[in-house]
Design a protein with these regions (language model features):
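N-proximal low-complexity "stem/linker" segments adjacent to membrane-targeting elements
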Residues: 1-5, 10-16, 25
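Conserved N-terminal catalytic core of the sugar/cofactor nucleotidyltransferase
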Residues: 1-5, 27, 31-105, 114-116, ...
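Active-site metal-binding loops of divalent metal-dependent hydrolases
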Residues: 10, 106-108
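Conserved beta-strand segments of alpha/beta enzyme cores
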Residues: 24, 73-75, 199-201
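Catalytic-core segments of class I nucleotidyltransferases/pyrophosphorylases
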Residues: 46, 102, 109, 113-126, ...
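Short beta-strand-to-loop element that shapes/binds the nucleotide-sugar donor at the catalytic cleft/hinge
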Residues: 55, 131-146
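Short acidic-glycine loop/turn motifs at beta-strand connectors
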Residues: 149-153
């Protein structure tokens, strides 16, 4: 199975920290945020990883190299201009293959085990599905949530619990068939269409999740990781935004 880490954002809310350093290389708990993702993926047996980048992307490649230092096989998908989430994934499809793949937003921190992606990918194939999303309880920053999750795991426009998309999902390449490579495109409209077709499912994660989208949350996560108060399981409180709108 292959994975993609989304790392092309400018990091406007992180300025001035991101004026000279790309957001994925900001350090938390003694290492760059993106390295936490790489290590967790490799530990789950997912070593083939594609990373997209735009702003200061050459620094990401210089810092991570080919991934051998982490036991990974890294490949890069540079974007001359940021293509947004769906546009970036569509451009990287030739490197991701024809099977369902895992996508992780580079600016979230979560204790979810990526090894669970194998089962979700198999379920997508078996049901001819297009998307599986990891969902979390709505944080105070995004109380309205994103999508409704029914008891049978189906994502729906109404009914069930309305939860927040965690920025982690398994996708079938067919979801992006209508996106022209090199064209900016948002992910949320594609997910809404998949939900309407009945090809999107999800699961609620009741563990730790944090959107590392502001300097304050970065500092809080760094302090907790460095202090050993959350280790591999995450911070005591989740904090987030509407990651499906990226």
């Amino acid at each position: 199975m292959r994975a993609m880490i989304l790392a092309a954002g400018r990091g406007e809310r992180m300025r001035p920290l991101t004026d000279t350093l790309p957001k994925p290389l900001l350090r938390v708990g003694g290492q760059p945020l993106i390295v936490w993702h790489i290590r967790r993926l490799v530990a789950a047996g997912i070593a083939d990883i594609v990373i997209n980048h735009a702003w200061l992307g050459e620094r990401i490649e210089a810092a991570l190299g080919d991934g051998a230092a982490f036991g990974a096989r890294l490949r890069y998908s540079p974007e001359p201009r940021a293509l947004e989430t769906a546009g970036g994934i569509a451009q990287a499809l030739p490197q991701l293959g024809d099977a369902p793949f895992l996508v992780v937003n580079g600016d979230v921190w979560c204790d979810w085990d990526p090894a669970q992606a194998y089962a979700q990918a198999g379920a997508l194939d078996a049901a001819r599905g297009q998307a599986w999303l990891l969902m979390v309880d709505n944080p105070e920053h995004h109380p309205q949530g994103d999508f409704h999750l029914l008891e049978n795991g189906v994502l729906a426009a109404t009914g069930g619990r309305r939860l927040t998309y965690a920025g982690i999902g398994v996708y079938h390449p067919s979801l992006f068939a209508g996106v022209q490579p090199g064209t900016p495109a948002r992910l949320a409209p594609l997910l809404v269409e998949a939900i309407a077709r009945g090809t999107a499912r999800g699961s609620r994660h009741d563990g730790r999740w944090v959107d590392v989208g502001t300097p304050q949350r970065l500092a809080e996560l760094d302090a907790m990781l460095a202090g050993g108060t959350i280790g591999a399981t995450g911070p005591g409180e989740s904090a987030g935004r509407n990651t499906s709108e990226s």
